[in-house]
Regions:
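Metallo-beta-lactamase
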Residues: 6-9, 15-17, 32-35, 41, ...
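Residues that act as N-cap/strand-start positions at coil-to-secondary-structure junctions
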Residues: 19-21, 91, 97, 116
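Active-site HxH/HxHxD metal-binding segment of metal-dependent hydrolases
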Residues: 39-105
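Short hydrophobic/charged patches on amphipathic alpha-helices used for structural packing
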Residues: 24, 46-47, 171
């Protein structure tokens, strides 16, 4: 685990069948720590993780990862997009969110269907968060865009997308937001000029 930005921690898991890491994130708020798509943690990193852990946000059905363990050990609530809830069965989702909602007063929900019906992105709104304001805006993405090949942006294999056309139509929406940092739950994060890089990628998709 490492602190990738002030008050924002990341850790990951590596799998032999894919060339990119699976990343989770922890954002420290005044009222507690919010996790995004958390993979398994080494016991030593459990001790480092800022407490209390109040919330786990899942961006899509395939990113449950270790969410249940965080709920069991810390009593964290699990949140997902309202159009994705049925995709998690038999996992119980504690609260649902939709386009425009704020989680913990600062994480803005962006609905990005295509990979799955209710995938969400999370925008750490600079209006409500000092670090995001200082960094020029921070965006978290689950599977809508991944950091592969390393150092570049890409999509997951098309056979894993419910509706590739819908996903391509959803992606321009994130360009309505101002961000310079892109923290990806699959693959390498982009720590500078992220919006420009996303804009160029979206244009290439057509």
């Amino acid at each position: 685990m490492r602190e990738i930005l002030p008050g924002v921690f990341t850790w990951g898991s590596t799998y032999a069948d894919r060339p990119w890491d699976l990343n989770g994130y922890a954002i420290v708020f005044t009222g507690g720590t919010v996790l995004i798509d958390p993979p398994a943690l080494e016991e030593a990193d459990w001790q480092k993780l800022p407490k209390p852990i109040t919330t786990v946000v899942l961006t899509n059905r395939d990113h449950v990862r270790d969410a249940v363990l965080f709920r069991t050990r810390h009593g964290a609530r699990i949140i997902a997009g309202k159009d994705e809830v049925s995709q998690f069965s038999p996992l119980t989702i504690d609260a649902v969110v939709q386009e425009g909602d704020l989680i913990d007063g600062a994480l803005r929900v962006i609905h990005l269907p295509g990979k799955s019906p209710g995938e969400i992105a999370l925008y750490l709104d600079p209006a409500y968060h000092a670090v995001s304001r200082k960094m020029g805006g921070i965006l978290f993405l689950g599977d809508a865009i991944i950091g592969n090949p390393p150092g570049a942006l890409g999509l997951i294999p098309e056979e894993k997308l419910d509706d590739p056309k819908t996903l391509r139509g959803s992606l321009p929406k994130i360009l309505d937001y101002q961000f310079e940092v892109l923290l990806l739950c699959d693959g390498q994060p982009v720590l500078s000029d992220a919006k420009q890089k996303v804009s160029e990628f979206v244009k290439k998709l057509g």
